[in-house]
């Protein structure tokens, strides 16, 4: 009907432009509710706005203007500026309340839009949504029985086969630089052409896919190369790829050629997984175990010095032109997690006791979700008494069985069963279902986009490199300050052992709590006897695993800290022996985990005590078995406290994650610029003990030679001269030394051996120090040149500064101590060391103009005794001031002269008691130039063939005592 022909037209309501503007403004920003028309327009509607003229500008404001002023004042208040408050009209009163949190994925829950996964910028991704149905096979899937005749196809050389599929490698040496939603668009590759209609078509550029290269080496044979973890050159275990253009009834052979683990469950009956889209659509069949002639073996290739291994199997596709998938384990992607979380929080009953929020963002920007599950508390006191339980999973992206156990755990704890309700009323659950979403998305097996294993970096302080680990640890640390955390468990997968088992930490606290950490795994083994193997549990704390979540949480104070490991294979227990695990089996372990929590925290402690007594019996049996293997017997009074339980267990190793421990990939190049020094290999204990024994043997040999050899100075000089280059020069010096030895013979009786207390002084030098010819001649100084010492009044009258000897390469230099004994002097008493003073006193006594020594007669007088007075040396205290009067008289009247000890060491040996013999200390070599008298008994001798720059001294018939030591 045309509006122009209408006779009963409604009167048009013309609102004030200002009111209309304010109405739309408030409605846009959420401050205007618009419940009823009368509430929307509080101001009266005017047909036209009154024009204010100059004549009526002085009139009082109208009622409308006053209300507008009130609106403007209210809008400026902080309450209205907040976006977290919403005002509601309840019974005529305006009540503010908090705004509901935003939807999980930043959109309304009605439109069904989800946040897409973010990929590294360089990763190509196909635009295809891949999903699989869940299916539990009616019959149990039996292990493959190896016959021993399985073929081992050799790896063909490069360029031999036809490449039918290839993507870019894992970017070894690079690092993560950025991400984008949905990844990069796929580009056409020339080398991915199908040679004929019978060739299979491969694809892995989808979420969690992993296949780098496929090469056709036979009519129906293909060699496959897996992509290593992104930004690394390691960890090839997980595979998941698509195959198209299949032919029914044709035996195809697939061989993966770059696996890195030395052993695998494929040699114990594990089969690969197959998924057929036609079977899923027509028969409702999902993932199932298939394959024949399965063999895991070592091939001829290597990578970075490590051998590579191959996995081969044959298979017949069930349909023609089918789309099939092969996988190492049941895939569970990041999108699968989002779908499961979406379905749970959309349930109104579930959302009442389950709150979901984002813990943090990963390196690529993907959300790491945190679920808080507990029943609402009626009062604050009840809520404060609740204890906490922390459960995490999927820190290793290739261990998808951990996600399936997590799915079973969430299905049970969020259900409406009475046991689940009791758990929610008793505990607060903090759940992180996927710790490493980036690795899951790109198809890694063990690492994140940092190129490192997250389960080795719980102690790291690099928040930006390991955000999920850092925030998870901070969350637990904050939770511990608020309430007690009775259990922490991280769900994992294991590739070398069957069944399900746990790794824990031995308690080192009070003896009453011993073995308590083993009670929960024992209870779990009783709840799942056909899947969980308690004997497979280990509780050893290894230093190489200190960065794991299990040990880090244990050190923070959580006694029951575990990792629950589920095999990639199946069970070897009970009626499930030699059968594969299905997704339903893995989810059932999550149910059993919750049942065990109820048993462990039951107020009735009868189960707890029964398990503890059984544990004591099992441990005693293990001890007896261990003692029997060692050939020892146990005493009757033997207790568990007499041994360390860790000694009974083997290592929990089975993974090579330590190879991916260290700095993130983007910091490795930076660190190498600052630290170029080559890392030294750490020696084992056996190597260290061997080196220690050899070093001690060499030191003992040197000490023995220093004590037994009668001429140490000549021996050292001989060794030093033999090292010089030139045969003639070497022979001349050896002849010269031999000639000198003939002229200056030494008797065995005139040599003083080294004291046992001086043994350590010879071990400071790494190499034997050489002694010059000049020093050797000084050591051979005859006693007749010294004569009798009667008085030295003017020697060392002033205090002089002692200059320390310079060290040689950080080693203490050998010091020469010469003890000159007259024939009429008594021997030195034992326990009294010679006076040690620096610098050496004999450097200036040599007369360079001739070969004969001269000694000043005016220095030594026969009318005074040396012991009549004490005298000071340069920089040290007097030595004779403490001698008693009787002893002094004996010394003065003694007709037997005393010994004279001359020492060259800069260190002064101080004793509690004063010296008992008079000593003379020479403070400076300047006082000895021309002081010593000429010898009366020794004739003048000259050494032919010896230059004057190295003076030699004649032999004497008097007693000579020469002592060379190293201090």
UniProtKB/Swiss-Prot annotation:
Cofactor detail note: Binds 1 zinc ion per subunit.
GO cellular component, one term: cytosol
Residue numbers binding Zn(2+): 396, 399, 492
Protein name: Cytosolic carboxypeptidase 2
GO molecular function terms noted in the UniProt entry: metallocarboxypeptidase activity; zinc ion binding
Organism from which the protein derives: Xenopus tropicalis (Western clawed frog)
Subcellular location(s) of the protein: Cytoplasm, Cytosol; Cytoplasm, Cytoskeleton, Microtubule organizing center, Centrosome, Centriole; Cytoplasm, Cytoskeleton, Cilium basal body
Keywords: Carboxypeptidase, Cell projection, Cytoplasm, Cytoskeleton, Hydrolase, Metal-binding, Metalloprotease, Protease, Zinc
Record-annotated Peptidase M14 domain positions: 330-601
Domain of life, source organism: Eukaryota
Annotated InterPro entries: Cytosolic_carboxypeptidase, Pepdidase_M14_N, Peptidase_M14
Database matches in SMART domains: Zn_pept
Start and end residues of each stretch annotated as Disordered: 679-706, 944-967
Family statement: Belongs to the peptidase M14 family.
Function: Metallocarboxypeptidase that mediates deglutamylation of target proteins. Catalyzes the deglutamylation of polyglutamate side chains generated by post-translational polyglutamylation in proteins such as tubulins. Also removes gene-encoded polyglutamates from the carboxy-terminus of target proteins such as MYLK. Does not show detyrosinase or deglycylase activities from the carboxy-terminus of tubulin. Metallocarboxypeptidase that mediates deglutamylation of tubulin and non-tubulin target proteins. Catalyzes the removal of polyglutamate side chains present on the gamma-carboxyl group of glutamate residues within the C-terminal tail of tubulin protein. Specifically cleaves tubulin long-side-chains, while it is not able to remove the branching point glutamate. Also catalyzes the removal of polyglutamate residues from the carboxy-terminus of non-tubulin proteins.
One family name in Pfam for this protein: Peptidase_M14
Catalysed reaction, written as an equation: (L-glutamyl)(n+1)-gamma-L-glutamyl-L-glutamyl-[protein] + H2O = (L-glutamyl)(n)-gamma-L-glutamyl-L-glutamyl-[protein] + L-glutamate
Enzyme class: hydrolase
Keyword Endoplasmic reticulum carried by entry: no
Record-linked Gene3D superfamilies: 2.60.40.3120, Zn peptidases
PANTHER family: CYTOSOLIC CARBOXYPEPTIDASE, CYTOSOLIC CARBOXYPEPTIDASE 2
Record EC number: 3.4.17.-
GO biological process, one term: proteolysis
Needed cofactors: Zn(2+)
Residue positions of the active site: 565
